[in-house]
């Protein structure tokens, strides 16, 4: 199982004081060195954390893959074609949200998403759609030609009871298997921590987890190398459990 380290909140800390540090590039290189299989960045329309220059700098510096999260807009499409990341994950985006609140509604935007997917694919960029674990959305993702889906784990991560968490886990598990049966590559992410990642990492249909906020939070106390190492180890151990 692969670990994508999202470095958005390195930029959040930097931007809080308008300094040049901490450096997203340095964070990406440290994460790679200590177990990250790819680097994920979300260039939001409001540029609240990652800036355009960060994306180019990280793309040019890293040795692994860059997974660029972006909204379904012409501006972001143009940016992606300039940066040429290995992967683009199309996500929903609202100006006032603190973080991504739900999955992309592929059903409601099939024609536009299909167009973006074709343009990016023709350019050699693999496309992923960040969606809820809903069979209709998964089927729609397949229908528009996206080769990858990333299942939104937020409802699982935010569950306030064991029963609710189990319900959301089963939804993710079923969705991952449905997507896998369609031939889609299945990733997952949002709200995952060292404390809740094990069940998700045990879903064999899921190939990659993208984790950011909790890793950066842990890094405040442990350092980024140890935070990445511990997360990678937790994922690896989960795969070994019966």
Curated annotation (Swiss-Prot):
3-amino-2-oxopropyl phosphate binds at residues 6, 17, 191, 212-213. Gene3D superfamilies: Aldolase class I. Coiled coil: none annotated. One of its GO terms (molecular function) is pyridoxine 5'-phosphate synthase activity. The active site is at 42 (proton acceptor), 69 (proton acceptor), 190 (proton donor). One of its GO terms (biological process) is pyridoxine biosynthetic process. The record marks 150 as: Transition state stabilizer. It comes from the Bacteria. It catalyses: 3-amino-2-oxopropyl phosphate + 1-deoxy-D-xylulose 5-phosphate = pyridoxine 5'-phosphate + phosphate + 2 H2O + H(+). Catalyzes the complicated ring closure reaction between the two acyclic compounds 1-deoxy-D-xylulose-5-phosphate (DXP) and 3-amino-2-oxopropyl phosphate (1-amino-acetone-3-phosphate or AAP) to form pyridoxine 5'-phosphate (PNP) and inorganic phosphate. Belongs to the PNP synthase family. PANTHER family: PYRIDOXINE 5'-PHOSPHATE SYNTHASE (PTHR30456:SF0). This is Pyridoxine 5'-phosphate synthase.
């Amino acid at each position: 199982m692969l670990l994508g380290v999202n470095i958005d909140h390195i930029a959040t800390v930097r931007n809080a004081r308008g300094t040049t540090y901490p450096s997203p590039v340095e964070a990406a290189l440290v994460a790679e060195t200590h177990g990250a299989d790819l680097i994920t960045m979300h260039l939001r329309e409001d540029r609240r954390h990652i800036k355009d220059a960060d994306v180019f700098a990280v793309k040019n510096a890293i040795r692994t893959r860059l997974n660029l999260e972006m909204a379904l807009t012409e501006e972001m499409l143009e940016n992606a074609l300039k940066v040429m990341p290995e992967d683009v994950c199309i996500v929903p985006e609202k100006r006032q949200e603190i973080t991504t609140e739900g999955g992309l509604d592929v059903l409601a935007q099939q024609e536009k998403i299909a167009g973006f997917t074709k343009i990016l694919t023709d350019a050699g960029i693999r496309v992923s759609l960040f969606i809820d674990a809903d069979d209709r959305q998964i089927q729609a993702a397949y229908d528009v030609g996206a080769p990858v889906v990333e299942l939104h784990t937020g409802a699982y991560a935010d569950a306030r009871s064991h029963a609710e968490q189990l319900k959301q886990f089963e939804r993710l598990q079923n969705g991952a298997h449905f997507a896998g049966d369609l031939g889609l590559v299945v990733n997952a992410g949002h709200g995952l921590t060292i404390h809740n990642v094990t069940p998700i990492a045990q879903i064999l249909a899921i190939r990659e987890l993208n984790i950011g906020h909790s890793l950066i939070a842990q890094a405040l106390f442990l350092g980024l190398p140890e935070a990445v190492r511990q997360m990678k180890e937790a994922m690896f151990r989960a795969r070994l459990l019966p």
